[in-house]
Amino acid sequence: MSLFLQLILLVVGFVMLIKGADWFVEGASKIASKFGIPQIVIGLTIVAMGTSAPEAAVSITAALKGSAEITIGNVVGSNILNILLILGITSVIIPLSVKKNTLNIEIPFVIIVTAILAFLGLKDGTISRLDGIILWLMFIAFLVYLFILSKKGIDTDADDVPELEEGDTVFKLLILIVVGGALIIWGSDVTVNAATAIARSFGWSERLIGLTIVAFGTSLPELITSVTAGIKGKSDIAVGNIVGSNIFNILFVVGTTAIITPVVYASGFKIDSIVCIATAALLFISVFLGKDKKLTNNGGIVMLISFGAYFMYLLRG
């Protein structure tokens, strides 16, 4: 199959993943609302996990196909890209406010879980099922933390639940769930197959394709959400969404994947893991030292320069 066709299939796969996740979340959330499940529970489970569905589907599919470098590359690459590129672009457009709990708790937590992921993976070269359970226990603890914040009236994903509309029958919503789920599964298969073929065509490693193209594709929803929030003046949402996404990527995506099938964590990810930890630390320092505890334009420029340097390192490596 030609390289051009594989590139088209990769784009199609990304579209299927993103649209499938949207439909699945909408259908599942609205059905849950119909059955009287509290908004806060829907927001912290269906909505929050659904937004990480593209990363999870690609990572699980890649691991099952024996392409573990795409699995880890997707997560590590997405987390680096989310901060350096997405927050970099957004903060250059408009300085980003950061909530107190995000600066004091969530960003440090990102640094901690990123370091834990690197330790678990590099200690013996595998994220085992036991490691996956450990990550999931931490994920549950994070959900409890978000639940407590929401009960205190602090904005979280619990506020992003789709509202029921006239004509939202159970049958219609079930179709959204089934079609959305099918698109996620099919889209992940198309994406992984196309990404693997492209890597072979260019003589690239699956690690490189996972850290770059696949990571960028699965991070598109975060890019759109953050830039839109910044432009609309809801800048505090932008940083919160990215930080939450990075935590979910490690604890939910890698944790779930490892429980299903142990994931090989190649030694080649050592530098990338260090960069991922440093990236989260850079976010903390940039906000902590920023005027009025904001991620300023200067901070955004530093992040974009850092992303450019890392990208050049990947291409040369």
What are these regions (language model features)?
Residues 1-317:
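Hydrophobic alpha-helical segments, chiefly the membrane-spanning helices
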